[in-house]
């Protein structure tokens, strides 16, 4: 009896030690901004061998990044959306690039058994890269699923095609497959899954969730992965086209990480001619590393250490703002367009001051002090509370301080990437009707400001020190998901938005 008791205790202690050893408090993350090799424009599909040749060219570059990341001790690496075959496809021209990707529940290591599900050379290579380098590999590729055309959901060509993220663990096993839910305009080559997929997997360094590019602007699967599935880290392959002033890749992705309280690994394509750049590794309290490069054609590998289980303190986004008397000065207000949305603005007249500006149910409050008030630069403080209807439909509440492109107030909200005015301090808040608010601070030359600001528990975005560079944007980007398809979004409102779109610019500002 005594000996059995001691043996049981020893076994339990041993199991505890193994469990502890297999659990990591921190991990080294890597993301790779990939300068994708694009296929030639064609109206007709290429052969499968031609498609595979192009994909292997891109996989050669991804292999270099994966091997380098593993040598430096990274536990996981994320590569971009469309990183294996590029962009600009039709439904037919993408087909030679697709493979059938099985449900990860099949327990499959493609590197060991590549023919189990037919011809899967891309999955085989990704699996071997993960296995041979003992690293988790996250990639984006195309999935094909045959269907019966007698099924009303089945496309006429008899197959579903999905924009798909795959994850292989350090043994080369397929552990996650995610079909992109929120397809962006121009992605006609892919189908939308009939139901959102909430894809997670566990590792010794936390619980991970996966979604892609345009998904970040919507509730499912993005928000649900955090609020219901309790993931620690989001993996985010993307092909994101920057939209200044408030939707630059590094700006919004880092803001989402802070607003949702998770780690966020964002790998973007690198194609400056298409405004595609901006990758990073973001923690809930601050960006850890970021990359933005419009000048070169080179890819970039980033590393950062992250906590496996980050701690996030809750924020009451209306607590402070609702206590401030809302008395906007009507005579100072003007209207200007930010990414097709009509904001209500006030000009910042002095080197320091306090302003309130309201639109519909949202009132925004600002206290600030500039380092100097330049005659050649104008800053404005604005509010928007309404339904965005161009290149997607989603309800926004935004408080934003921004540099205007010129001293003409009508340029407030236009894209600008340089500034000269630093801010000694700022405090920004708003009466948001949502708990999903994402804090943004963007500096001149499209740089982030890690460690220079924080969000207080009462909902203020406040500076911790003078800004290290001139300011482009300081904002609180709120999403009211429940109003995206509200019946009170009148046809007159949508028509007005379309008129604005036609008047402001003939150029489409693609996101991803």
UniProtKB/Swiss-Prot annotation:
Signal peptide: 1-23
Residue stretch(es) of the prosequence: 489-512
GO cellular component term, pick one: extracellular space
Cellular location(s): Cell membrane
SS bond list: none
Modification(s) after translation: N-glycosylated.
Span of domain CN hydrolase: 32-308
Keyword annotations: Cell membrane, Glycoprotein, GPI-anchor, Hydrolase, Lipoprotein, Membrane, Signal
Gene3D superfamilies: Carbon-nitrogen hydrolase
KW Iron-sulfur (keyword) present: no
Function: Amidohydrolase that hydrolyzes specifically one of the carboamide linkages in D-pantetheine thus recycling pantothenic acid (vitamin B5) and releasing cysteamine.
Entry similarity comment: Belongs to the carbon-nitrogen hydrolase superfamily. BTD/VNN family.
Protein name in UniProt: Pantetheinase
Gene: Vnn1
């Amino acid at each position: 009896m005594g000996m059995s008791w001691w043996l049981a205790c020893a076994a339990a202690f041993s199991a505890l030690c193994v469990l502890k050893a297999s659990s990591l408090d921190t991990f080294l993350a890597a993301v790779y901004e990939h300068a994708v090799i694009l296929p030639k424009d064609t109206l007709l599909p290429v052969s499968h061998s031609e498609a595979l040749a192009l994909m292997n060219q891109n996989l050669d570059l991804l292999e270099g990044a994966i091997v380098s990341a593993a040598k430096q001790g990274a536990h996981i690496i994320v590569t971009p959306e469309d990183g294996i075959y590029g962009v600009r496809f039709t439904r037919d021209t993408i087909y030679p690039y697709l493979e059938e990707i099985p449900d990860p529940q099949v327990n499959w290591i493609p590197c060991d058994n590549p023919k189990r599900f037919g011809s899967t050379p891309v999955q085989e290579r990704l699996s071997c890269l993960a296995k041979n380098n003992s690293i988790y590999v996250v990639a984006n590729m195309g999935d094909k699923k045959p269907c019966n055309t007698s099924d009303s959901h089945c496309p006429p060509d008899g197959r579903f095609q999905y924009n798909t993220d795959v994850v292989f663990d350090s043994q080369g096993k397929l552990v996650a497959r995610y079909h992109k839910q929120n397809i962006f305009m121009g992605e006609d080559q892919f189908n939308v899954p009939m139901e959102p997929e909430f894809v997670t997997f566990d590792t010794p360094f936390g619980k991970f969730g996966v979604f892609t590019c345009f998904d970040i602007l919507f509730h499912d699967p993005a928000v649900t992965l955090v609020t219901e599935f309790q993931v620690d880290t989001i993996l985010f392959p993307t092909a994101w086209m920057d939209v200044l002033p408030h939707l630059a890749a590094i700006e919004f992705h880092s803001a989402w990480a802070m607003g949702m309280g998770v780690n966020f690994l964002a790998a973007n394509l690198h194609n400056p001619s298409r405004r595609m750049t901006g990758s990073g590794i973001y923690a809930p309290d601050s960006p850890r590393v970021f990359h933005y490069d419009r000048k070169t054609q080179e890819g970039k590998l980033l590393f950062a250490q992250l906590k496996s289980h980050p701690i996030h303190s809750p924020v009451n986004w209306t607590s402070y703002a609702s206590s401030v008397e809302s008395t906007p000065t009507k005579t100072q207000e003007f209207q200007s367009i930010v990414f097709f949305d009509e904001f209500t603005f006030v000009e910042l007249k002095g080197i320091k001051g306090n302003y309130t500006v309201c639109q519909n149910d949202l009132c925004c409050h600002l206290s600030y002090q500039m380092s100097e008030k330049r005659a050649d630069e104008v800053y404005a403080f604005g509010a928007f509370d309404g339904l965005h209807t161009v290149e997607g439909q989603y309800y926004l509440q935004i408080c934003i301080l921004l540099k205007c492109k010129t001293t003409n107030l009508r340029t407030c909200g236009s894209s600008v990437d340089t500034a000269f005015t630093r801010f000694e301090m700022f405090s920004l808040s708003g009466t948001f009707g949502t708990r999903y608010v994402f804090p943004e601070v963007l500096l001149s030359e499209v740089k982030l400001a890690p460690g220079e600001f924080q969000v207080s528990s009462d909902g203020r975005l406040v500076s911790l020190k003078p800004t290290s560079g001139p300011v482009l944007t300081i904002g609180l980007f709120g999403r009211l998901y429940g109003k995206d398809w509200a019946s009170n979004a009148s046809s007159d409102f949508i028509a007005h938005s379309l008129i604005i779109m036609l008047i402001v610019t003939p150029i489409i500002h693609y996101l991803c």
